[in-house]
Amino acid sequence: MTARLRPELAGLPVYVPGKNVPGSIKLASNETVYGPLPSVHAAIERAVAVVNRYPDNACVDLKAALAMHLGSDVAPEQIAVGSGSVTLCQQLVQITSAAGDEVMMGWRSFECYLPIVQVAGAIAVKVPLREHTYDLDAMLAAITDRTRLIFVCNPNNPTSTVVDPDALVRFVDAVPADILIAIDEAYVEYIRDGLLPNSLELALSRSNVVVLRTFSKAYGLAGLRVGYAIGHPELITALDKVVMPFAVTNVAQAAAIASLEASGELMARTDALVAERTRVSTALRDAGFELPPSQANFLWLPLGSRTEDFVQEAANARLVVRPFASEGVRVTIGAPAENDALLQFACDWIARTER
């Protein structure tokens, strides 16, 4: 390689997605097992017929549909659309943080935070989790005069936990008003047990709060890449200044609009997944696993030094799960038969290894 590249790239990790091994059960990427609803599939087919045309760069129809879906308090000018919420995370770093500035997050958390911060030349401040959950008090204590952006991944990926809703409000109120807080809610549709935060109210009533959501998880459009942000109009304008033109295809926009129109059917699927989450969690705990209560479409198994053995043995059993170094394993809740296969393996594994 003779071209001169930025030296910062030398220490930059390459994002490694969940493996896809033909013939195996994939429980590694937090995807829904359901395909598009018929109405969404039809919208996709109609949009494919005009892929010779550029998409609407402003996503006018999608923003209008989102505003209607989110409620009367949300206006289209308070919404930004991106090619998945991860690109909006990148845009947030771009509009807030320069070289030497600090971007804070709990850790372990969403892996993409680190590279997008490092590429910007900013400094990632990783605040350790407390009981697998974002430690908001510790994050407050870690704020400095260089802090520009704070990510709160809620539910947290990969540990599946949420922060207490009241604690989140207190945290937002305590953070200096010139620091942007990004509440990353990729898995918000799976939150139950009275733990759903009023994040939209936070974003609409405070100019330094932005909420990120996606169509990749509960809506099942991971392959089309559509995410959105809700925040103050000035913040949304700033996001639009750094967006890649035509990043959200017309197919993706059409599918997202159709999904919003069918949100009742899609949320019924989510209820079914939550029931499976409860079933699988209970069975794993009964078998001897320790895991935090999940509010996402996946479970976190904090296996520590046993992580590698679990992952390798799972692969031998044709199960693909997501390891995180020597910390633990993230397991997606799949279809009932897939979950049964996981339970059979996991129960056999723990019985064998804890003799």
UniProtKB/Swiss-Prot annotation:
Entries under NCBIfam families matching the protein: hisC, PRK03321.1
Relate the protein's function as given in its record.
Aminotransferase that catalyzes the conversion of aromatic amino acids and 2-oxoglutarate into corresponding aromatic oxo acids and L-glutamate.
**InterPro entries named in the record:** Aminotrans_II_pyridoxalP_BS (IPR001917), Aminotransferase_I/II_large (IPR004839), ArAT (IPR024892), HisP_aminotrans (IPR005861), HistidinolP_aminotransfase (IPR050106), PyrdxlP-dep_Trfase (IPR015424), PyrdxlP-dep_Trfase_major (IPR015421), PyrdxlP-dep_Trfase_small (IPR015422)
Give residue numbers for the modification (N6-(pyridoxal phosphate)lysine): K217
Q: Which organism is it from?
A: Mycolicibacterium paratuberculosis (strain ATCC BAA-968 / K-10)
Family recorded in the similarity comment: Belongs to the class-II pyridoxal-phosphate-dependent aminotransferase family.
The UniProt record lists the EC number as 2.6.1.57
* Protein name, entry field: Aromatic amino acid aminotransferase
Reaction(s) the record says it catalyses: an aromatic L-alpha-amino acid + 2-oxoglutarate = an aromatic oxo-acid + L-glutamate
The UniProt GO MF terms for this protein read:
aromatic-amino-acid transaminase activity; histidinol-phosphate transaminase activity; pyridoxal phosphate binding
What does this protein need as cofactor? pyridoxal 5'-phosphate
Judging by the UniProt lineage, the source's domain of life is Bacteria
Q: Which SUPFAM superfamilies match?
A: PLP-dependent transferases
Report the record's Gene Ontology biological process terms. L-histidine biosynthetic process
Keyword terms: Aminotransferase, Pyridoxal phosphate, Transferase
Q: Identify one Pfam family in the record.
A: Aminotran_1_2
Write down the top EC class of this protein.
transferase
Subunit structure and binding partners = Homodimer.
